């Protein structure tokens, strides 16, 4: 039986970023590979968000159903308009307050985003993380990285690179070890495709914080967290 290769590991901090390793990670992502990396919430399992084959690799590595949408990570607010067709005013207000940060917004997707990335939906989940390592990697990869949590489905979301290596070390190409994440709690997901914003997943940004900014907000009780 063919022996699986262990992921390449690069260690760095937000204060001392390894530019060569970031460039290497960016090339892996551009070429359809998978790179795990730190964000302020949990470690993400990254693939090129605009490459349908890369998105399918993410589903396979996680053992995740392919109809479960992936979150697209950006590192420049100006890149949002390329992957969505509309940004409601309330979404822009929330982004101004909480981006970069642990907020994911669901918006109508542009044609450039493949259905494999969105789980077949006409909307796309987008986040602008505040972690500097994540931002540098996303930019090196071309600006759009699909990244759910870097764990096999059903396991806890990883807060260290060691967790990722133990779980996915033989299924992915590279792990960027940025140490312990700052928050350790998933991003809050808010759907802006309806008239009233809907919280699909509670997270670091609380319902009270959202209502302070948006006013009326609903919670989807049926949503799978």
Q: Which residues does each PLM region occupy?
A:
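Active-site-adjacent structural elements in enzyme catalytic cores
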Residues: 2-225
């Amino acid at each position: 039986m063919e022996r699986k290769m262990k992921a390449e590991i690069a260690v760095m901090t937000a204060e001392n970023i390894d530019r060569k390793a970031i460039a290497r990670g960016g090339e892996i992502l551009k070429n359809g590979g998978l790179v795990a990396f730190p964000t302020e919430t949990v470690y993400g399992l990254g693939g090129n968000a605009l490459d349908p084959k890369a998105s399918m690799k993410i589903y396979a590595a996680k053992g995740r159903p392919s109809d479960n949408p992936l979150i697209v990570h950006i590192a420049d607010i100006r890149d949002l308009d390329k992957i969505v067709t509309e940004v409601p005013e309330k979404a822009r207000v929330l982004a101004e307050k909480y981006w970069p940060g642990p907020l994911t917004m669901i918006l109508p997707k542009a044609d450039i985003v493949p259905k494999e990335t969105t789980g077949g939906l006409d909307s796309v989940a987008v986040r602008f993380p505040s972690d500097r390592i994540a931002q540098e990697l996303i930019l090196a990869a071309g600006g759009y990285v699909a990244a759910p949590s870097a764990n096999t489905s059903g396991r806890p979301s990883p807060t260290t690179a060691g967790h990722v290596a133990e779980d996915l070390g033989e299924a992915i190409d590279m792990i960027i070890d940025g140490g312990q994440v700052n928050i350790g709690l998933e991003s809050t997901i808010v759907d802006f495709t309806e008239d009233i914003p809907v919280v699909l997943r509670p997270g670091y940004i609380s319902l009270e914080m959202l209502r302070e900014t948006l006013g009326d907000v609903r919670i989807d009780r049926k949503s799978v967290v």
